[in-house]
A protein has these predicted regions:
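C-terminal cap of thioredoxin/glutaredoxin-like
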Residues: 81-154
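Solvent-exposed, acidic/flexible segments
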Residues: 21-28, 50-54, 72-77, 87, ...
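Charged/polar, low-hydrophobicity segments characteristic of intrinsically disordered regions
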Residues: 67-84, 126
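Structural alpha/beta surface segment adjacent to cysteine/selenocysteine redox centers
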Residues: 1-74
Length: 154
């Protein structure tokens, strides 16, 4: 859906991770931020690209949690292993780089979205940093694209 909205509106959509969600929230933010930093270095800007490390990690964690009922009772290392294995990132590489400045700056930048998440829940869409779309009122992808286009012009 995001690539279709980007194409139709000419806007760039950025995904944020909310570290307040889930037991391993900060670890998740650092994992996703590291994947995004590596994607950017590889020239991958489309987060739906099958080569995107972010997509691979995100999809693996989503599937494990929502489809398989995984709650990672074995701890943070097991949680991280799910995303790292899917993205093909060695655990020692991640451990060495998870606290680097680029990763921390990106993960910290997502904290501004917490208040939006409290209002809308997830996923939440904010247009140009000003307009929060209440997704419960959206009836179709085309309706969402049209609304985003209108809000972007304001």
């Amino acid at each position: 859906m995001v690539p279709a909205m980007e194409k139709a509106t000419g806007l760039k959509f950025d995904m944020f991770h909310l570290e307040t969600k889930g037991k391993y929230g900060r670890a998740g933010s650092e994992l996703f931020a590291y994947c995004l930093v590596k994607d950017k270095a590889a020239g991958i800007t489309n987060l739906e690209d099958p080569k995107s490390l972010f997509k691979k990690a995100k999809d693996a964690i989503y599937k494990a949690y929502h489809k398989k009922g995984e709650r990672w009772t074995a701890g943070e290392e097991a949680f991280l292993k799910t995303g790292l294995d899917a993205a093909g990132i060695p655990a020692d590489e991640f451990a060495k780089n998870r606290k680097n400045a680029d990763v921390q700056a990106l993960a910290d930048s997502w904290k501004a979205s917490y208040d939006v998440g409290k209002i809308q829940g997830i996923p939440a869409y904010v247009v140009n940093g000003k307009y929060l779309i209440m997704t419960k009122s959206i009836r179709s992808v085309n309706g969402m694209v049209e609304l985003i286009g209108e809000l972007a012009k304001k």
